[in-house]
């Protein structure tokens, strides 16, 4: 689940609160939809890892989730999913977006949010409504893919995000007093590596 970049300034000013909201909304979305018999009718296992940067080291708030391909029914029986992806991406997207923006709006109404200069205008209720309405109209893009030859490989893939630094020494190409140049993967699989200077 990736949050639109329009949220970045507000999230940055409210990291603990809004990272927590992201965790909550991801879990609730997956659990609520999984419990629906249309999709699974059971409670799956879920692992979530918050990630706050991308290959270019930009602030890019998103949640990696691993969800089991089945779960426990209310009768404590194991139920397997019928297909590869048992919840359609558009259903996940719409449920998550509605949940996140609704709870974010509740935080706003209850004066729980901090505002810095980068998002200070949102303190004005008219600005807030306009900003929020634009986020509702924007298409949010959750990304779903099949595991890599089994659950163990998915855990290994996720582990690379949780047990490494943002950039390894082997990626650093040059360092000057003012800049660092490093190589990053292509944005899509199969694209060549890129050089980025910060």
Tell me the role of every PLM-derived stretch:
Residues 1-198:
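Beta->alpha loop/short-helix hinge microenvironment recognizer with preference
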């Amino acid at each position: 689940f990736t949050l639109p970049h329009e949220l970045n300034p507000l999230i940055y000013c409210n990291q603990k609160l809004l990272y927590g909201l992201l965790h909550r909304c991801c879990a609730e979305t997956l659990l609520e939809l999984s419990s629906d018999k249309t999709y699974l009718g059971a409670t799956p296992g879920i692992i979530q890892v918050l990630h706050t940067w991308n290959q270019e080291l930009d602030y890019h708030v998103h949640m990696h989730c691993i969800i089991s391909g089945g779960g426990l029914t209310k009768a404590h029986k194991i139920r397997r999913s019928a297909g590869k992806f048992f919840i359609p991406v558009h259903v996940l997207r719409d449920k998550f977006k509605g949940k996140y923006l609704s709870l974010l709006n509740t935080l706003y109404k209850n004066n729980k949010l901090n505002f810095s200069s980068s998002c200070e205008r949102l303190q004005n209720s008219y600005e807030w409504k306009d900003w929020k309405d634009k986020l509702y109209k924007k298409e949010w893009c959750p990304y779903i893919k099949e595991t890599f030859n089994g659950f163990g490989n998915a855990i290994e893939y996720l582990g690379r995000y949780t047990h490494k630094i943002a950039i390894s020494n082997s990626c650093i190409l040059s360092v000057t007093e003012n800049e660092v140049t490093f190589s990053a993967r292509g944005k899509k699989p199969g694209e060549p590596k890129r050089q980025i200077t910060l």
